[in-house]
């Protein structure tokens, strides 16, 4: 029997699979569906105080891109499809939204799970006030999203993406001072030094880190010669998994081993969850897979993880967390590779 619980420090999850913040978790119905599917936690759609952020939902658009970067049918898109979108924040008035989340989290207790309140930042002080209000309403866990991929494209003052370590420290410290509940901080990899962002988030009081947010992207349609979506957008896909796991592994090795890391961006199946754990994550946040395949994918991921652990004789998830990261050598420590030819030699005369 394998214990698939995950130790996230102040949070003990029944399993490491978290339904990430997305349009799927923008309604009570979506949150309930993810809980019913077996998610260890569900991160609600983000909110903030900026009217421009809420209005961004009015221009939201979502497409799946296939491996040829063409728009694909949602019903036929496979595991390799990439989500390319403009998304927005929940438009429900904050007081109503937070009250709904509190009710949802009360329901989550009956599933031995959590509903997490998510804040995408515009300014630090309002984010801190929202966090305090969430705690006062009874929420047990808050996520601070500093990685909003639309930050560079949105109207001024709507949302921000923080890529400066000092700014990360200041925003996290402001929210940490306003609340005592466990705080997760979601970071971007589009920075000169993502590890420095992680270090500053922890120094400022983050309990857990989520790595890494989606990327800004641009893709033309070669037939119409126009930009898909009519603009830039945020993009993520299974192709991003090695990029996510690179920074998970680096943070796992550089930060104290007591720092819980959550991987996001690129997980599509149970095997990908395993890859994240081997890289140093203690859990995963999945969004695109749920949007594409429905909340049933959560149960499929859990089943894949359970089958793997039984096959490998793993009793606790801690046995595999970071195993591959610890085995990774720096280039300078690698032995010379002995070879007599290269694969591309067949093209050379």
Where in this protein do the model-derived segments appear?
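C-terminal helical cap(s) of enzyme catalytic domains, especially alpha/beta-barrels
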Residues: 51-67, 220-236, 291-314
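C-terminal extensions of enzymes
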Residues: 291-313, 318-349
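Short beta->alpha connector loops at strand-helix junctions that form conserved
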Residues: 45-46, 265, 287-288
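Alpha/beta enzyme core
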Residues: 32-37, 41, 110-111, 122-262, ...
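Flexible, active-site-proximal loop/turn residues at the rims of small-molecule/cofactor binding pockets
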Residues: 23, 48, 148, 215, ...
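N-terminal capping/small domains of soluble enzymes
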Residues: 1-115, 120-128
């Amino acid at each position: 029997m394998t214990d698939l619980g995950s130790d996230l420090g102040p949070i003990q999850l029944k399993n490491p699979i978290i339904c990430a913040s997305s349009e799927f978790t923008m309604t009570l119905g979506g949150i309930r569906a993810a809980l019913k599917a077996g998610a260890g936690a569900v991160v609600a759609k983000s909110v903030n105080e900026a009217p421009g952020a809420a209005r961004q939902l009015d221009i939201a658009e979502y497409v799946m891109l296939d491996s040829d970067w063409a728009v694909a049918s949602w019903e036929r898109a496979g595991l390799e499809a990439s989500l390319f979108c403009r998304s927005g924040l929940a438009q429900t008035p904050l007081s109503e939204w937070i009250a709904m989340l509190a009710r949802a989290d009360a329901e989550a207790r009956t599933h031995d799970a959590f509903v997490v309140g998510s804040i995408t930042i515009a300014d630090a002080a309002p984010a801190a006030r929202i966090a305090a209000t969430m705690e006062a309403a009874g929420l047990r866990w808050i996520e601070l999203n500093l990685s909003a991929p639309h930050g560079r494209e949105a109207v001024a003052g709507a949302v921000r993406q923080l890529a400066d370590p000092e700014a990360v420290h200041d925003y996290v410290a402001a929210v940490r001072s306003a609340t005592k509940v466990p705080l997760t901080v979601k970071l971007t990899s589009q920075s000169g030094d993502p590890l420095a962002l992680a270090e500053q988030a922890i120094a400022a009081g983050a309990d857990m880190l989520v790595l890494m947010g989606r990327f800004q992207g641009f893709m033309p349609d070669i037939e119409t010669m126009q930009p898909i979506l009519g603009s830039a957008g945020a993009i993520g896909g299974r192709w991003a998994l090695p990029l996510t796991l690179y920074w998970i592994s680096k943070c796992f090795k550089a930060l104290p081993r007591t720092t819980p890391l959550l991987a996001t961006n690129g997980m599509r199946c149970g095997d990908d969850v395993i890859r994240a754990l081997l890289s140093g994550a203690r859990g995963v946040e999945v969004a695109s897979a749920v949007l594409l395949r429905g909340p049933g994918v959560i149960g499929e991921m859990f089943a894949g993880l359970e089958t793997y652990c039984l096959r490998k004789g793993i009793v606790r998830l801690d046995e595999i967390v970071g195993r591959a990261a610890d085995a990774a050598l720096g280039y300078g420590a690698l032995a010379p590779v002995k070879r007599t030819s290269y694969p591309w030699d067949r093209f050379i005369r």
